[in-house]
């Protein structure tokens, strides 16, 4: 009979010993791995907050009171119209009032009427309060936002008739709403390739908005032809623990703003879950001539 070699004489127990050691070590390694990943996640969360724009309010001339009209749609089809009224009701306040509604055959399928009012500080361009009402065929949603230096309180009612408001608090210093974020960005130099990052709370959630100045170009809209500043907008949702999450419905948007003393919002093209949607300036009139 042929004698067995040294490796062939190895017992089953000896062969299994490395596996036993691995099994014993793994429970100790896994918690360490999870702790490391949690640390990395926490560090990333802190890192994005460190990238927020810290530039003070710019010295670009403030916007004159105006009235403007827009149309909204997709693939060249107009689905809704809207009107805005920008005013300065007091020396220390800016105010934006807006209304919008679906039209045509789109309204037969999806009835929606919207009213919006936002008030911001004329000195700091920080939001004070926002009121938004959405009236659908079968329900009505009202959202009221009250801002402080430390965050925002949201009161929201939903239903056909009077309903109890559900409140929610989101604490984050130096928040913007949609209106004040536009005012702040408008005040900046907006040099080519510059990047601005702000946290905005438009209605129900907070988002990290990253705005990049792509460059300058000519654009024609219904209201006229303009030299324009072209901007890229990306959004990330901010979760309960301040972690960044992808926006479920919004991918990115391209925005054109007039490259003049007014810096009017001319056109937006947004990539969303249904395709490309747009908003375009139809007409504008100033209440105070130059």
Positions of PLM-derived features:
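Serine residues within intrinsically disordered or low-complexity segments
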Residues: 3-4, 22, 42-43
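Bacterial N-terminal signal peptides that target proteins for export
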Residues: 10, 16-33
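Bacterial N-terminal signal peptides
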Residues: 31-41
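Acidic, serine/threonine-rich low-complexity disordered tracts
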Residues: 46-149, 189-290
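An N-terminal domain-start capping segment
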Residues: 33, 124-130, 134-137, 172-181
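Hydrophobic, well-structured mid-protein blocks that either form specific transmembrane helices
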Residues: 145-187
């Amino acid at each position: 009979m042929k004698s067995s070699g040294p490796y062939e004489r190895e017992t089953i127990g000896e062969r299994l010993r490395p596996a036993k050691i691995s099994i014993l070590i793994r429970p100790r390694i896994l918690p360490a791995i999870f702790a490391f990943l949690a640390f990395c996640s926490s560090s990333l969360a802190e890192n994005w907050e460190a990238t927020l724009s810290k530039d003070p309010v710019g010295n670009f001339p403030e916007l004159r009171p105006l009235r403007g009209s827009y149309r909204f749609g997709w693939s060249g089809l107009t689905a809704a119209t809207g009107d805005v009224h920008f005013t300065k009701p007091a020396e220390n306040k800016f105010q934006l009032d807006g209304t919008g509604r679906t039209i045509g055959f789109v309204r037969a399928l999806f009835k929606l009427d919207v009213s919006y009012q936002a008030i911001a500080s004329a000195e700091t361009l920080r939001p004070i309060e926002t009121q938004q009402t959405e009236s659908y065929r079968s329900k009505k949603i009202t959202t009221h936002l009250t801002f402080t230096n430390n965050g925002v309180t949201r009161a929201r009612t939903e239903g056909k008739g009077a309903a109890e408001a559900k409140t929610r608090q989101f604490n984050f210093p130096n928040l913007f709403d949609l209106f004040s974020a536009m005012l702040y960005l408008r005040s900046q130099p907006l040099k080519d390739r510059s990047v601005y990052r702000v946290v905005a709370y438009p209605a129900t959630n907070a988002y990290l908005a990253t705005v990049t100045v792509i460059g300058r170009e000519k654009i024609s809209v219904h209201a006229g032809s303009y030299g324009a500043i072209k901007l890229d907008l990306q959004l990330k949702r901010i979760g309960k623990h301040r972690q960044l999450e992808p926006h479920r419905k919004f991918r990115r948007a391209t925005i054109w703003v007039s490259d003049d003393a007014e810096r009017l919002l001319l056109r937006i093209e947004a990539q969303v879950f249904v395709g490309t949607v747009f908003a375009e300036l139809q007409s504008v009139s100033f209440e105070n001539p130059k």
